Amino acid sequence: HGAHKNPYRGRNPAWLSGGIERDGFIHWSQPEIVLYDLDPENCSFDAETGLPGEGGGMSYPDLIEQDGSYWITETQKTVARVHPIDSTLLGDLWSQGNVRTVTQKGLILDLARPHLADGEVDLPRLPDLAEGGGLSIDFWIQLEVMSAGQIILDSRNASGEGIVVKTARNGRVRIEMNDGKNSGRWASDREILQPGSWHHVAIIVDGGPNVITFVVDGLLGDGGTTSIYGWGRFSPELSDVTGSEKLRVAPSLLGRLGRLRIYDRYLRTSEAVANFHAGR
């Protein structure tokens, strides 16, 4: 999820995956961000695309377990650090696929059919991303035609402030955010949407590491065969992206939505996976 041709680059953020042994094989979970560095030199990115740059990051990690608690150690030249790891993060990694309930914490909007056909709904104010807040957009979608530019969700005002989620070329979903001064954007991996099929999409915007991830049908985007990264960065100055406080639902969608949930926090990958397994 961050492999760079130069092994000394692309190490921020750091990811953690949990393995479970079954029938002699280790089955690995979808990864979570476990550590990140806010040093600007290690957070470089292309402002036009969101594509991460070549910044460095954590080195030589070790996992320590003692009396049911966990830590990760890491070093940078002459500096060494020890980080306690939230045990619930590890527990969620190991239980991925077994949890099949919808996450309720932070849920501020939950629309099911027929309310998805209302066209426009009130959107509660979203957290300030520049202050470390986050948001997640979680929906089920079935497209009739896979063409770029179909608007799935749109909270933008007349000045362009807000969020828009739309289809993009090569079977992708794209999010664009604007606070009036700063913007951020990222798209899912290619060919993840197939016309006529139901897909679950979770877009996770985390104002801690300033990272956008996509979890589609229970799988965290990793860039596939066409990109080094499956996640993108946005400016640490990007703040309030609520926009008009009205959310237009599927204004130009050639298809239909089966469920829409918006959270006023970032979801863990494991929570997005659980929402997928919970179904529509």
How does the language model describe each region?
Residues H1-D39:
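Loop/turn-rich, solvent-exposed surfaces of beta-rich toroidal or solenoidal domains
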Residues H1-H4, T75-K77, D206:
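Short loop/turn segments immediately following the C-termini of beta-strands
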Residues N12, G57-S59, L135, S197:
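Beta-rich catalytic cores
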Residues S17-E21, H83-I85, V215, Y263:
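Hydrophobic/aromatic beta-strand positions that recur at structurally equivalent sites within the blades
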Residues D23-Q66:
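Conserved blade-ending motifs and adjacent loop-strand segments that build the rim/top face
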Residues I26-Y36, L93-T101, T225:
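Beta-propeller fold detector
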Residues G57-L107:
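Blade-level signature of beta-propeller repeat domains, shared across WD40, Kelch, NHL, RCC1
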Residues V102-R280:
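Extracellular glycan-associated modules
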